[in-house]
């Protein structure tokens, strides 16, 4: 009786681990006498992405209930069956199950209605119908507020924020995430429900090129997700940390973060998601190989590409159901396009990019359009079409300006840096956005790039036992924009090993151990 009374409130506060331990401590016969506890266990397992075990709990509930399931238990079963169907990749079938369950719900069943709206939003998001997904997530937030399920309100707001990011509405997404944080922290600063909001803010700060802030937020998302044993928080923290560390040039750290995500998805029995993680790993290895001259990393990326069959079979895979949801397919195929470009197969790369751009335009995913147009610009440049390359880059800049995108351009590498000045000056961007982009690239949109590199900024005042040299300040500023050692060396016309030596001196003078700490310490000291 005590567990039955407290399990659901615990679950609504995102404490899945405690609920699972409670229910697994009971004899199976006791759960059979209270079939609703089988359902509560299933929901707790879903929260941890332990979907195979969740299905076992659903089957146990169905056996215990027989034909005597009332409206509430029947509604729970229908939603869980839809969720497991969705996880198996049968999106259309899952939507039909959810809609039938919604029709059968009694009046006032806000808890179940909130669950259904949340799952309908997820299904439409996977189907790449962003307007429908946004509508259902908004309804989920309202119904879950009425039901008192704060955690599911936060999940709904997380999805709404992610949709805004996809649509290029980064400022609105940040406002919504901060609102979610305030709501979550009403339940205590260490509320697991805050994990996803921290992850959203980490993603946005990364895009706005505040990498130290992004590292801190992504780490917080992971810690809170781990504290509550909430898989969404762990995944958001892992994926975002991987992207931030990739931008910082910490490739081993980025790969380790992806390893954590893969462990979660393997436990969930989700091989299609794992395949996406493998693609993201290949993208990191590609960056590592180009940035550090690491032949082994390049070979690893090439092995993934060959083994996946996507270099030649991308068209069939893009149209089929091999990957879970259009957006996740796109993450994979952006890596494929980059590998095709690296191999010099620009024709195939441009054909793939044209299909990806059409998908992104159809659903209004501005962020994706920006990423595709940047790669299109690189492909056209490789073909010698300078005018076409600049036109594609200007298109990306125009789409990116309202959200203030910066990092997506920086991460495209030095080839984009060579075109950015011309593209900025010809794109009609606002002076503020043009200035922020120019500063991020270490150039001035109003002057030749060579002159911008040659003109150091005024040296800041330093209150350090041993002040940084002018060259060390230059290195620190470039590293703070997220450039790798190799890219910073190219800007300063010095070897990557020399950049590394300067960084070692900087760490010693600032009393730090890595670039993230050094950037944070330098900001606090007014050096940046």
Protein language model annotation of sequence segments:
Residues 452-510, 517-528:
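Helix-turn-helix DNA-binding segment
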Residues 303, 307, 311-321, 419, ...:
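Intrinsically disordered or compositionally simple regulatory linkers and C-terminal tails
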Residues 1-98, 102-111, 117, 291-294, ...:
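Flexible inter-repeat linkers and adjacent short helices
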Residues 237, 246, 257-271, 275-418:
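Alpha-helical solenoid repeat scaffolds used for protein-protein interaction
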Residues 7-8, 20-28, 59-69, 99-109, ...:
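Amphipathic alpha-helical segments of tetratricopeptide repeats
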Residues 4-9, 36-50, 73-90, 112-129, ...:
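Tandem amphipathic alpha-helical repeat scaffolds
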Residues 282, 337, 372, 377, ...:
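Hydrophobic, well-ordered secondary-structure elements that form the walls
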């Amino acid at each position: 009786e005590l567990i039955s009374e407290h399990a659901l409130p615990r679950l609504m506060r995102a404490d899945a681990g405690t609920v699972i331990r409670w229910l697994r401590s009971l004899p199976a016969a006791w759960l059979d006498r209270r079939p609703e506890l089988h359902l509560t266990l299933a929901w707790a397992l879903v929260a941890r992405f332990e979907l195979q075990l969740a299905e076992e709990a659903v089957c146990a509930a169905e056996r215990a209930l027989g034909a005597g399931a009332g409206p509430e238990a029947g509604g729970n079963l229908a939603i869980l069956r839809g969720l497991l169907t969705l996880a198996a990749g049968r999106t259309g079938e899952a939507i039909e199950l959810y809609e039938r369950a919604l029709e059968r719900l009694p009046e006032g069943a806000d808890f179940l209605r909130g669950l259904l709206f949340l799952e309908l939003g997820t299904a439409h998001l996977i189907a790449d119908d962003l307007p429908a997904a946004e509508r259902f997530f908004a309804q989920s937030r309202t119904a879950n507020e009425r039901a008192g399920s704060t955690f599911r309100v936060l999940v709904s707001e997380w999805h709404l924020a992610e949709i805004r990011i996809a649509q290029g509405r980064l400022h609105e997404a940040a406002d919504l995430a901060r609102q979610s944080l305030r709501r979550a922290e009403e339940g205590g600063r260490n509320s697991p429900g805050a994990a996803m909001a921290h992850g959203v803010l980490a993603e946005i700060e990364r895009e706005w090129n505040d990498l130290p802030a992004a590292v801190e937020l992504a780490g917080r998302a992971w810690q809170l997700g781990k504290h509550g044993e909430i898989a969404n928080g762990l995944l958001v923290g892992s994926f975002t940390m991987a992207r931030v560390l990739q931008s910082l040039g910490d490739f081993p750290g980025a790969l380790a973060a992806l390893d954590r995500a893969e462990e979660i998805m393997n436990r969930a029995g989700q091989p299609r998601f794992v395949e996406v993680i493998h693609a993201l790993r290949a993208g990191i290895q590609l960056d590592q190989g180009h940035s550090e001259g690491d032949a082994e990393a390049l070979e690893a990326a090439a092995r993934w590409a060959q083994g996946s069959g996507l270099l030649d079979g991308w068209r069939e895979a893009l149209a089929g159901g091999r990957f879970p949801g259009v957006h996740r397919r796109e993450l994979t195929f952006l890596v494929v396009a980059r590998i095709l470009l690296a191999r010099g197969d620009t024709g195939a790369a441009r054909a793939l990019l044209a299909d990806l751009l059409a998908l992104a335009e159809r659903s209004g995913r501005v962020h994706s359009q920006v990423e595709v147009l940047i790669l299109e610009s690189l492909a056209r440049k490789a073909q010698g079409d300078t005018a076409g390359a600049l036109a594609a880059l200007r298109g990306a800049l125009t789409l990116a300006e309202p959200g203030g995108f910066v990092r997506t351009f920086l991460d495209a590498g030095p080839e984009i840096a060579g075109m950015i000045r011309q593209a900025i000056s010809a794109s009609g961007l606002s002076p503020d956005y043009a200035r922020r982009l120019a500063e991020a690239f270490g150039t001035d949109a109003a002057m030749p790039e060579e002159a911008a590199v040659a003109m150091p900024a005024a040296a800041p005042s330093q209150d350090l036992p041993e002040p940084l040299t002018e060259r060390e300040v230059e290195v620190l500023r470039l590293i703070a924009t997220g450039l790798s050692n190799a890219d910073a060396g190219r800007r300063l016309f010095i070897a990557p090993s020399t950049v590394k030596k300067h960084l070692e001196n900087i760490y010693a003078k600032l009393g730090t151990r890595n670039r993230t700490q050094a950037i944070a310490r330098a900001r606090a000291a007014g050096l940046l």
